[in-house]
Amino acid sequence: MTKTSISEDKIKFYNLHKSFFSDLDNTSCEVFDNKVVIFENSNENADPASVELELKKDDIYSIYYWDGYSLADTYQTKDYSSAMKHYKKYAKKLAKNLRRY
């Protein structure tokens, strides 16, 4: 059975974090009922790099990619599978950028 909500996919998000960020010690993954965030643990940067997937009102999924300086990309959809696809894309991009610096 395909999971269709953030809270039902907690293990999937934790495994995604382990897969993309296993060699980066300064990252964390937090999963809530309507939101999941992978972020850089940084005491130096007040606006750390992160990728967020959030279920907003009217069943709209919003994905935000912060590059550590500003909001770099956003995406909104009503389709959960499309939201997951974009979330994975931005998570991979975040991991790649964190390895550079």
PLM-predicted stretches and their roles:
Residues 1-12, 65-101:
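Mixed-charge, Lys/Arg-enriched low-complexity segments
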Residues 34-35, 58-59, 79:
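Beta-strand-connecting loop/turn residues
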Residues 1-45, 101:
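Negatively charged, low-complexity tracts enriched in Asp/Glu with abundant Ser/Thr
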Residues 45-72:
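Short aromatic-glycine-(Arg/Gly/Cys) micro-motifs in beta-strand/loop hairpins
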